[in-house]
């Protein structure tokens, strides 16, 4: 039980709230639900890497924007460390997912990777090991999607310097939840 509370501490709960709610999944899905798709396929299907990528991007965005700085500089620094830990975890999860499905990773190596290199609590790592065995490439969507969304936002910021941050993010979220490569075309 203490492993659970070490993992889900105050800073993790703030980061998780950003990821799952605002401005993460809840905001992204609200925009997606308002989108009027031109085809039934666009209305039904969505990109997992875009959805998870947006949520991971939102974690970084909030820290960069000063979330928790109003509480104290220590709270803001602790949240930054948590956000970086989660970003490291997304990279390690991607490595683990690929290596497991390429038959190049056993349980003991996966646990060592997650616990020793990724600072995951053992209880969390056991759950992740089960998850990687039941899904294929889903754990990669967080990091791959984050990189795609981050790069898209950076390119839009460069190409449309007159846009406010809100205009930029509304444009990214306003086309539903397509794969980022298609979103680039839609925003061109």
Please place each PLM-identified region on the residue numbering:
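Long, His/Glu/Asp-enriched segments that create or flank divalent metal/ion-associated functional microenvironments
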Residues: 1-188
